[in-house]
Amino acid sequence: MFINYAHRGASEYAPENTMSAFNMALQLGANGIELDLQRTRDGKIVIFHDNKIDNKSNKKGKISDYTYQELLDFDFGSWFSLKYKGEKIVLFEDFAKKFLSKSLTFAIELKDEGIEKETFDVIKKCNA
């Protein structure tokens, strides 16, 4: 079987690793999604690729510098296009609830050490 991976979602058409990019990937016919996971300061697992948020949001620093609640106040879409102003960072559990039940293949890169068990627990919980 051929897998058409949407790298960080449909990142050519919407801000990478956002719900807009993941939804667009499905609309364009992707049957696989690649995404990256990191841990916030308060231990939440979010989807984000870069080491720093500087180029993909309206703030500066690392994901681990902020709580998930703080990150929700940031704009992760305007860097790509004003059409996506206000785009939010994605909690992995929210992604999993929406997409794991679909007939897709996933490539998940863990950017932080020690998040393997939590990631697997979310997958088990949302894929039951």
In which residue ranges do the predicted regions lie?
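Phosphate-group recognition and catalysis centered on beta-loop-alpha active-site segments
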Residues: M1-A128
